[in-house]
């Protein structure tokens, strides 16, 4: 796509507004290539990749190259990254497996949009090291430990949202490897076992049911068959969506976040409910600023921004990705669709101790 030809989504976002939001992301990028949450804020590798994906969609390919090369330069020897960076310093030395895996989704998306295999080959060793690191933390029941603390000690449990994203990243990594003629090792096997646990043993994951991401992320990541995915979205809609205002980050509070709202729209598109996706994405207009940035969240009924006056790069990025999914403007618009083989993981049988 050329940023000169961005399509309008009437009542949601215009082509000019998409370009303005992309320029806002570019304005946040540091000379190193890092994309922080906001000016002077920290950066985490997952949201950094999300922002790079949005830049690719909007045609800012060189800026996306800089973002991915920043990530490559800071990858640790085992394939991981720290959780938060503030400029060139480490703000939080925890290592989150989901955060580490997402580069695979980012580079596969890059290939889908641009067709550029040269840059993808440059980045493939980064992707391979990251996915091999994440795969090494899979447990006997198929789940993947969610993090290691700053001393390198792994947590004993797994998270549903993070594991769903890891599943998606593993599948993207396999498609990337296939496109490049590179080996993907055991990534499919790891994804099969993880997908089985996600689809059939949700109790194996730490209970976080109040969070909207635990509701829609198994759908967004392609873990569930279409019928089950639609049922999941329908069952949780009233609990997690606040009237016409968007998605509650946490179901117990009327705090609507634009990033979760945009991701929910992506999940709705994934199951073929484009009209519902348009309706829910339209709620993000309340969050939009004139400069193309988006308020992170709005608390109701007072309609105050929370965190106060905070805009965030990942929110702007999620809006652009949802726009692309709905307008099909780039060849990467279906990165979060249900293209993955839904028959892979229902019957692992004796290899899954949770089935015994």
Each language-model region and where it sits:
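Alpha-helical positions within canonical tetratricopeptide repeat
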Residues: 63, 119-122, 126, 185-186, ...
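Extended glycan-interaction surfaces of carbohydrate-active proteins
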Residues: 2-42, 65-100, 124, 129-157, ...
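N-terminal beta1-alpha1-beta2 module of alpha/beta enzyme domains
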Residues: 28, 37, 41-49, 53-60
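Well-ordered alpha-helical scaffold segments within catalytic/enzyme domains
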Residues: 1-11, 49-61, 102-119, 164-182, ...
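Loop-centered beta-sheet repeat module
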Residues: 155-201
